């Protein structure tokens, strides 16, 4: 299914055909550009495929570039009655990959997108060519920052998330048209609900709903160690800190390591040239 982007700003900044994948009653937005070896881009929260616009434009010349919006984010549907647990996001990714018949995939994953992407990868290692992780949560021993701990308080969390832009302070310095493309999809009640469910689904104790899924993923990461891999880390990210970086180094001791000194939560906006250069060389070196 093909549609036109609803934001006027996107015609200039995001000149890609919007496509939609049906999953049950809902639509998942994605872009599918170029041809060649497959790159699958997975965004962090509360970002969306817009964060990868420069990479899509650059790599579509020699690759087939797929980038999808997670349920509840970007231009995907934002149903109030959807179960936003990790397992369901992973199921959507699996369905999309099957539907598009994607094979020998190189994943480029950021934040929550890394968690979902790795959930797929450990279950389908034969379909993974290589992977690059940008700042992401450790699968165990992850401590929520205080601002998100407060959002887990039952009587208070919804009021905070519905009333405050928790994740967008870093974009205030961006050009107005870029800022609008990030902020507009986050303003609705339905979008705020998806942000809250994301926060609530981050496991902090073994009893949390997605804790078992996270541990199962972590225990299976060894299967991917022979794959070409890289870890790219923004040093100023307040959510996924150096402690997470050290865990990812333990997961993949042979991975190429890169640190971006001046980049923060919105890594692709803070260091676009550096990020593109690292990825270009990685893809060339491993012929991905």
Residue map of PLM features:
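Catalytic active-site module of serine/aspartate enzymes centered on a nucleophile-bearing elbow/loop
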Residues: 255-288
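Conserved serine/cysteine hydrolase catalytic core
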Residues: 191-250, 259
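Active-site loop/oxyanion-hole signature of alpha/beta-hydrolase fold enzymes
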Residues: 21-24, 31, 67-109, 277
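The conserved beta1-alpha1 loop
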Residues: 42-44, 110, 233
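Conserved HGGG/HGGXW glycine-rich cap/lid loop of the alpha/beta-hydrolase fold
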Residues: 31-75
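Alpha/beta-hydrolase fold catalytic core
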Residues: 1-39, 60-63, 98, 102-103, ...
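Conserved hydrolase catalytic core segment
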Residues: 103-142
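Helix-rich cap/lid subdomain of alpha/beta-hydrolase
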Residues: 142-197
């Amino acid at each position: 299914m093909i549609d036109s982007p609803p934001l006027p700003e996107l015609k200039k900044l995001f000149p890609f055909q919007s496509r939609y994948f049906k999953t049950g009653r809902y639509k998942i937005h994605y872009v599918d550009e170029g041809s060649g070896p497959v790159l699958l881009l997975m965004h962090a929260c509360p970002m969306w495929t817009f964060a990868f616009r420069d990479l899509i434009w650059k790599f579509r010349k020699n690759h087939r570039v797929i980038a999808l919006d997670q349920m509840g984010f970007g231009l995907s549907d934002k149903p109030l009655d959807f179960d936003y647990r990790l397992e369901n996001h992973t199921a959507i990714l699996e369905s999309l990959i099957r539907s598009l018949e994607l094979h020998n995939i190189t994943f480029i994953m950021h934040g929550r997108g890394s968690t979902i992407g790795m959930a797929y990868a450990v279950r389908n290692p034969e379909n993974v060519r290589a992977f690059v992780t940008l700042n992401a949560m450790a699968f165990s021993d992850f401590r929520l920052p205080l601002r998100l701990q407060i959002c887990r308080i039952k009587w208070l969390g919804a009021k905070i998330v519905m009333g405050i832009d928790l994740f967008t302070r870093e974009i205030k310095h961006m050009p107005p048209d870029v800022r609008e493309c990030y902020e507009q999809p986050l303003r609705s009640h339905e979008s705020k609900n998806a942000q809250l469910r994301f926060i609530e689904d981050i496991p902090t104790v073994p009893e949390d709903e997605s804790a078992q899924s996270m541990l199962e993923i972590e225990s299976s990461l060894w299967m991917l160690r022979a794959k070409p891999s890289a870890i790219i880390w923004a040093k100023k990210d307040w959510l996924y800190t150096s402690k997470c970086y050290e865990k990812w180094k333990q997961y993949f001791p042979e991975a190429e390591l890169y640190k971006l000194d001046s980049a923060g939560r919105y890594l692709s906006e803070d260091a676009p040239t550096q990020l593109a250069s690292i990825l270009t060389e990685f893809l060339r070196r491993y012929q991905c």
